[in-house]
Amino acid sequence: MSRKLLSLTALGAASLMALTACSGGTASSSQSSTSAAASSSSSAPSSVTIESDQGNVEIKLPVQRVASLDNRTFEVLAQWNVPLVAAPKKLIPSTIKAYNTDSVADIGMHRDPNLEALAASNPDLIISGQRFTRFDSQIAEMNPGVPMINLEPRDGKPLNEELIRPVNDLGEIFGHQEDAKKLVDDFNNALNRAKKAYDGKSTVMAVDVSGGNIGYVAPSKGRTWGPIFDLLGLKPALEVQGSTDSHTGDDISVEAIAQANPDWIFVLDRDAAISKDGSYTPAQSVIDGNAALKNITALTKGQTVYAPNDTYTNESIITYTEILNSI
């Protein structure tokens, strides 16, 4: 055999060995990639247990068809791009557009809900709470086997803890733990900033403006603002016996407000959240336009804080972060 032929034969063998080695490396790499993916998939939790107000609830993961009845969840879920199959659409704040679609079944208002529409949406998780809590037993009966959680703030628990708890739970359910942590951190930072900003002696009154009327929001128990008094250690300008948690505030005369002469006034504009654009008188116009209030310290010094317009139908941890940052 000639030397040239031997060389060509050796070259061919070497090329074949190299090709085989490359092929083997690719296969090995592919197998490693597949193994890594399988490992990642197998490490994902198949369920999570949530401490609902009614006890522990096991939820199979991933959740595919969510129905939420708790208006405190809508903004958080929308930020995380979590789709819903059913919700009380008229209770969704107008600032949230994600669920204003035909793909979301409308179960109506809490006064007369369409629970049949909820069941027909075939949810694999129901988030109840707040206005719909009283229907929990009926909802459970109509949706057998479907996990339902209620993360309504519990009586006697600090508001900050009860705002943080549902966000962390939702983060675990939908795999948004880092996003939940960010919301909690933002809230805690706002809370700490507001605590440092308060001088400890200025008097504060909270009011709820609805239908052009000014209602008294009681410290601790009143709507939205009540728990803020406890969180920040605010000094009430006036304490009314027999006060309630009425959604429009308790009856009070503007003369009583003027006599209390608060250094600060915190305002919830209920109509801004539930009325159509332009069909109501804004709370600021009601407050600023009242002759009996024009000389109180809060107004003369410009120390009036208005909650975001969608607060009454929102009240999520995001809303409270905005409120605290405005104080």
Predicted feature residues:
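Bacterial Sec-exported substrate-binding components of ABC uptake systems
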Residues: 2-13, 18-72, 177-209, 268-280, ...
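Proline-aspartate-enriched helix->loop->beta-strand connector
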Residues: 122-128, 144, 257, 261-266
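A short, structured surface patch at a secondary-structure boundary
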Residues: 65, 70-117, 125, 131
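Extracytoplasmic substrate-binding proteins
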Residues: 56, 144-212, 303, 310-327
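Short helix-initiation/N-cap motifs at beta->coil->alpha
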Residues: 52-54, 107-114, 243-252
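Structured C-terminal subdomain patch of bacterial secreted/periplasmic proteins
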Residues: 263-327
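Ligand-binding pocket segment of bilobal, Venus flytrap-like solute-binding proteins
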Residues: 198, 211-216, 234, 245-274
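Alpha-helical, coiled-coil/dimerization segments enriched in small aliphatic residues
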Residues: 91-95, 218-248
